[in-house]
């Protein structure tokens, strides 16, 4: 996984942002 992150940092960053956004969305909908 670390090798893929080094070779494609933009892909890893995008996946991280999407994962974080999904977690926040689920938490937000869960609180509501």
Swiss-Prot record:
On the 2D-gel the determined pI of this protein is: 4.55, its MW is: 31 kDa. The keyword Hydrolase applies. Keywords: Fibrinogenolytic toxin, Fibrinolytic toxin, Hemostasis impairing toxin, Hydrolase, Protease, Serine protease, Toxin. Its EC number is 3.4.21.-. This is Fibrinolytic enzyme 2. GO terms for biological process: proteolysis. Optimum temperature is 60 degrees Celsius. Active from 30 to 70 degrees Celsius. Serine protease. Has fibrinolytic and fibrinogenolytic but no plasminogenolytic activity. Cleaves after Arg and Lys residues. Cleaves fibrinogen alpha chain, beta chain and gamma chain in that order. Optimum pH is 10. Active from pH 7 to 11. InterPro entries: Peptidase_S8/S53_dom_sf, Peptidase_S8_Ser-AS. The keyword Protease applies. One of its GO terms (molecular function) is serine-type endopeptidase activity. Residues 1-32 form the Peptidase S8 domain. Inhibited by PMSF. Not inhibited by benzamidine, aprotinin, SBTI, EDTA, EGTA, 2-mercaptoethanol, iodoacetic acid or pepstatin A. The active site is at residue 5. Belongs to the peptidase S8 family.
